[in-house]
From Swiss-Prot:
PROSITE patterns documented for this protein: T4_DEIODINASE
Domain of life: Eukaryota
Similarity annotation: Belongs to the iodothyronine deiodinase family.
Catalysed transformations (reactions): 3,3',5-triiodo-L-thyronine + iodide + A + H(+) = L-thyroxine + AH2; 3,3',5'-triiodo-L-thyronine + iodide + A + H(+) = L-thyroxine + AH2; 3,3'-diiodo-L-thyronine + iodide + A + H(+) = 3,3',5'-triiodo-L-thyronine + AH2; 3,3'-diiodo-L-thyronine + iodide + A + H(+) = 3,3',5-triiodo-L-thyronine + AH2
EC number: 1.21.99.3, 1.21.99.4
Function statement: Plays a crucial role in the metabolism of thyroid hormones (TH) and has specific roles in TH activation and inactivation by deiodination. Catalyzes the deiodination of L-thyroxine (T4) to 3,5,3'-triiodothyronine (T3) and 3',5'-diiodothyronine (3',5'-T2) to 3'-monoiodothyronine (3'-T1) via outer-ring deiodination (ORD). Catalyzes the deiodination of T4 to 3,3',5'-triiodothyronine (rT3), T3 to 3,3'-diiodothyronine (3,3'-T2), 3,5-diiodothyronine (3,5-T2) to 3-monoiodothyronine (3-T1) and 3,3'-T2 to 3-T1 via inner-ring deiodination (IRD). Catalyzes the deiodination of rT3 to 3,3'-T2 via ORD.
Segments traversing the membrane: 13-33
Lineage: Eukaryota, Metazoa, Chordata, Craniata, Vertebrata
UniProt cross-references to InterPro entries, sorted A to Z: Iodothyronine_deiodinase, Iodothyronine_deiodinase_AS, Iodothyronine_deiodinase_I/III, Thioredoxin-like_sf
Protein name per its UniProtKB record: Type I iodothyronine deiodinase
Length: 244
């Protein structure tokens, strides 16, 4: 094992400790101060009011919550993106099954907006119309690409009530079928899926959802990770500035 791999595993162990401590403390607070915890959760939910507190709050600090948060935190250790830096040219798959890469969708100096997400992530779907309006308003100066990644809240994982019912993808065909559900929403831009190695999700630290703007192979804008910090309006501001 090389030094870089050893360092990665040491960081993973540290993250494991942090997440385990967070879950343990969260459970204790739920028992000792249930009303105060609920107040805090309700305040967080105001950022995404379309999804009811009762649909997701009871799942906080569950075993499924622990494993999902750990996976997200571990993936973020592999983040290879920074504003101004070179954008990772990860392999992706078109809905037809054809393999390609992210850079294949860049056209000269036109900005390319990347939208990472999945159907089981409520904020991704609730803000889908906002994203479509971006395409309508800026298609003359920018290109757009949706990259469907692993499910945020699969029915056999950290599942929410009254959510889209999709299991974790066991193979590429499962992922392609899940991504095809987005076609019912008329996305108005190409839709591709991440490979089963989740390379784009890892290198762009995209789970559960995230927005980027690329230009000439570099990262012009790096949105914060969802669900609470997934903001299509920030992309609008970037594109308006470019267009002015």
């Amino acid at each position: 094992m090389g030094l870089s791999q050893l360092g990665l595993w040491l960081r993973r162990l540290w993250v494991l400790f942090q997440v385990a401590l967070q879950v343990a403390v969260g459970k204790v607070f739920l028992i000792l101060f249930p009303s105060r915890v609920k107040q805090h959760i309700v305040a967080m939910n105001r950022k995404n009011p379309h999804f009811s507190y009762d649909n997701w709050a009871p799942t906080l600090y569950s075993v499924q919550y622990f494993w999902f948060v750990l996976k997200v935190r571990w993936q973020r250790l592999e983040d290879r993106t920074e504003p101004g830096g070179l954008a990772p040219n990860c392999p992706v798959v078109r809905l037809s099954g054809q393999r390609c890469s992210i850079w294949d969708f860049m056209k000269g100096n036109r900005p390319l907006v990347l939208n990472f997400g999945s159907c089981t992530u409520p904020s991704f779907l609730f803000k889908f119309d906002q994203f479509k309006r971006l395409i309508e308003d800026f298609c003359s100066i920018a290109d757009f690409l949706i990259i469907y990644i692993e499910e945020a809240h699969a029915s056999d994982g950290w599942a929410f009530k009254n959510n889209v019912n999709i299991r974790n993808h066991r193979n590429l065909q499962d992922r392609l079928q899940a991504a095809c559900l987005l076609l019912d929403r008329s996305p108005r831009c190409p839709v591709v899926v991440d490979t089963m190695k989740n390379q784009s999700s890892r290198l762009y630290a995209a789970l559960p959802e995230r927005l980027y703007v690329l230009q000439a192979g570099r990262i012009l804008y790096k949105g914060k990770p969802g669900p609470w910090n997934y903001h299509p309006e920030e992309v609008r501001a970037v594109l308006e500035k470019l267009h002015s």
